[in-house]
């Protein structure tokens, strides 16, 4: 049996010039031989310099994320209080992946997924891979097998808090289980992170909030499952419902949704701390017309004067709800404004930008012609009245 040649550390010295270049080339060749091609490369040679993304399913959130969506091959954590819209945000990502022809899996550790609600959000429930594991290790092992297959584009785990270790389930209520879940999650993160990166799978972990006891200063809020997920996540989103969306007046007022604030508290692929405000409507999910209207007004694409909203000098509604209904009924106008907003935030490629510019020019020409036509009609009416 051949013995492995030992390194003589006495011979290790700093190299310079041609000797250094040869030493580096030899080291690279040895690393490639021992660990495989691509195990070490110059950053400029890397094929994945630009982070590729999958859409979050929300325009406002895509903009807040900076890169245009959730990064592929990375871990994302979505956390917040109960009923804040965490699962809704994740399901919109599932729908967006399926819309692009991708495969998504949902590991429902909480056993609380509503198929009808998922369907209303645009999820193809016939194609969605669903698992309801008996214990935490089983759920994470299923996730690992899906990720290492390289066939799945998105895996959602709902939720970390519900991934209960088998030892805790097999034990009695009241038995001490300190640190079991944290150790399980720490081991899972160490194993999954590399596989997720290699297969370019996006893994979304939904998490709940807990409160630390005896905290005098700072926020007492924390997330279960230990610290591993916080460290391994490239993106962390804090989801909180803020303002009620109501219809009717007086005693007849009914809540039909809520304005939800999504804060990007950690982002390794773009500047963090951006905020997305989305309208989550009950039974419908994130309102695409609502978020588009808000962003377009901010960008000056849609003009707001008092309660009136106007696009290309044409009024589209008095009040936000009427303007949203107009955009729902006029898909061509919705698509045109959507393109302009995406172009303004750099979410389009070069060909789409050129297409948007052409559409904008055509739209302006059409609006100008319509305005001139109206002016001619007015002039003719005035002449008739004079006669």
UniProtKB/Swiss-Prot annotation:
Principal location: cytoplasm
Bias (Acidic residues) occurs at: 349-360, 378-387
HAMAP family hit by this protein: RecA
**A biological process (GO) annotation for this entry?**
DNA repair
| Function noted in UniProt | Can catalyze the hydrolysis of ATP in the presence of single-stranded DNA, the ATP-dependent uptake of single-stranded DNA by duplex DNA, and the ATP-dependent hybridization of homologous single-stranded DNAs. It interacts with LexA causing its activation and leading to its autocatalytic cleavage.
Does the record bear Zinc-finger in its keywords? no
Q: Answer whether the UniProt record assigns the keyword DNA repair to this protein.
A: yes
- Annotated family: Belongs to the RecA family.
Q: Where does ATP bind?
A: 80-87
Its protein name is: Protein RecA
Q: Which UniProt keywords apply?
A: ATP-binding, Cytoplasm, DNA damage, DNA recombination, DNA repair, DNA-binding, Nucleotide-binding, SOS response
Any one Gene Ontology molecular-function term assigned to this protein's record: ATP-dependent DNA damage sensor activity
Tell me what organism the protein belongs to: Lactococcus lactis subsp. cremoris (strain MG1363)
Identify the domain of life: Bacteria
Cellular component aspect of the GO annotation: cytosol
PANTHER family associated with the record: MITOCHONDRIAL DNA REPAIR PROTEIN RECA HOMOLOG-RELATED (PTHR45900:SF1), RECA (PTHR45900)
Q: Identify the coding gene.
A: recA
Region of interest called Disordered, as start-end residue ranges on this chain: 348-387
Which subcellular locations apply to this protein? Cytoplasm
């Amino acid at each position: 049996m051949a013995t492995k040649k030992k390194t003589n550390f006495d011979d290790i010295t700093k190299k310079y010039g041609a000797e250094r270049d040869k030493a580096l080339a030899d080291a690279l060749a040895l690393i490639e031989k021992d660990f495989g091609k691509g195990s070490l490369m110059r950053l400029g040679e890397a094929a994945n310099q630009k982070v590729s993304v999958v859409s979050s399913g929300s325009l406002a959130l895509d903009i807040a994320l900076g890169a245009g969506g959730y990064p592929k091959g990375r871990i994302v954590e979505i956390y917040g209080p109960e009923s804040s819209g965490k699962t809704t945000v994740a399901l919109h990502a599932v729908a967006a992946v399926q819309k692009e022809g991708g495969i998504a899996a949902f590991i429902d550790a909480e056993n609380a997924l509503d198929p009808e609600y998922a369907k209303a959000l645009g999820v193809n429930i016939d194609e969605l891979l669903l698992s309801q594991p008996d214990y935490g290790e089983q759920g994470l092992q299923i996730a690992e097998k899906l990720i290492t297959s390289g066939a799945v584009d998105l895996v959602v785990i709902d939720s970390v808090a519900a991934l209960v270790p088998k030892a805790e389930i097999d034990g009695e209520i009241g038995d001490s289980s300190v640190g079991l879940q944290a150790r399980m999650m720490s081991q899972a993160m160490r194993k999954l992170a590399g596989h997720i990166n290699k297969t370019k799978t996006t893994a979304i972990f939904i998490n709940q909030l807990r409160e630390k006891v005896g905290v005098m200063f700072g926020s007492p809020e924390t997330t279960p499952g230990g610290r591993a997920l916080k460290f391994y996540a490239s993106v962390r989103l804090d989801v909180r419902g803020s303002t009620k969306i109501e219809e009717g007046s007086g005693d007849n007022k009914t809540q039909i949704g809520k304005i939800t604030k999504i804060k990007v508290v950690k982002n390794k692929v773009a500047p963090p701390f951006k905020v997305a405000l989305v309208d989550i409507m009950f039974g419908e999910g994130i309102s695409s017309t609502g978020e588009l209207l808000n962003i377009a007004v901010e960008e000056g694409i849609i003009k707001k004067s008092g309660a009136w909203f106007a696009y290309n000098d044409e009024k589209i509604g008095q009040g936000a709800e009427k303007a949203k209904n107009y955009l729902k009924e006029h898909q061509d106008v919705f698509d045109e404004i959507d393109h302009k907003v995406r172009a303004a935030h750099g979410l389009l490629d070069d060909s789409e930008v050129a297409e948007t510019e052409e559409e904008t020019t055509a739209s302006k020409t059409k609006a100008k012609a319509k305005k001139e036509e109206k002016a001619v009609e007015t002039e003719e009416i005035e002449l008739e009245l004079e006669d």
